[in-house]
Amino acid sequence: MIVGCGDVGMRCAAQLRARRENLRILALTSRRSRCVELRAAGVVPVVGDLDARATLKRIARVAPVVLHLAPPQATGDVDRRTQALVAALASPRRPSRQLAPAYGRLRAWRTAARSARPPFQTSAIVPDALPRPVVVYASTSGVYGDCGGARVDETRAVRPANPRARRRVSAERQLRRATARGALSARIVRIPGIYAANRLPLARLEKGTPALVEADDVYTNHIHADDLASILLRAAVRGKPARVVHASDDTELKMGDYFERVARAFGLRSPPRIARAEAERQLEPMLLSFMRESRRLANARMKRELRIALRYPSVDDFLRTVSAPRPLK
């Protein structure tokens, strides 16, 4: 079951469907208007809202693997949505007759999983110890706060610098506690900036939004959305309980350099560069929050433990595949 089935969730579903059409994939959605879109993608919609616990009763024990891709709510330091999800998944209540086949046809699930082809060797995607679900949580590398450009591995202590990151730390801790008490088995994937053809900063470049000068600029980290989907699925199979893994490629660029690479690939003008003091006066708070944090994520654990070979090892590898550049404006 995919919770928070947006762009990345749909990519996860597509990758699973491409390998085994009869694999039953559910998606929790709070909007009935999305049901048609989900069904067209071969996904069974389950209507429920993480902000309304009473609507989540149907998801108890409904799926052996849960991809938790939903962001926290917009306020507070505690992720109440993850609280609601953990409570629902740990509930002893049996699922309704309509949703029961996700577990009732366990033999079919295992047969489908065993016959899947690489890179998704999903033989473990239906765990033996049902009904304890495997939960793969899509967290953020923002939990580390500013690291001064240092290389960061998964053992580094978290130091969230804003409420958004503190809510992510809250979610991680809730899932680890639930794992410790045997309610579920969580894997935590910390994710940097996600890019894809539909997730590039083209509007920002066309608008001429400034970047920081080299001396003030910060290191950023990246992962292509398709590679991220692969990592999330592989974490369900090869991830270890309560274990953290970085979903990051090999790119080592500062933010302004990333924008310049994208601009060059699409025939756009490079962003103007300004000092940090000027950026504090000009730019919106959300963008500034990213400009205040610099780190370089290590991805050795991802490659070693999940046995991931990235389709796009770097941003440059992806940009070489884009269509002909637009003319300069």
Pin down the residues of each PLM region.
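NAD(P)H-binding glycine-rich loop region in Rossmannoid oxidoreductase-like domains
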Residues: 30-88, 99, 107, 111-114
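Glycine/proline-rich active-site loop of Rossmann-fold NAD(P)-dependent oxidoreductases
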Residues: 169, 181-182, 194-207, 234-245, ...
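Mid/C-terminal beta-alpha module of Rossmann-like enzyme folds, strongest
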Residues: 231-287
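Amphipathic terminal alpha-helices
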Residues: 313-329
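Catalytic helix-loop patch of NAD(P)-dependent Rossmann-fold dehydrogenases
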Residues: 148-188
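Conserved C-terminal active-site "lid" loop/helix of NAD(P)H-dependent oxidoreductases
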Residues: 260, 280-309
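Conserved Rossmann-fold NAD(P)-dependent oxidoreductase catalytic core, especially the SDR/UDP-sugar
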Residues: 86-99, 103-110, 114, 119-163
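A conserved pocket-lining segment of Rossmann-fold NAD(P)-dependent short-chain dehydrogenase/reductase
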Residues: 203-223, 227
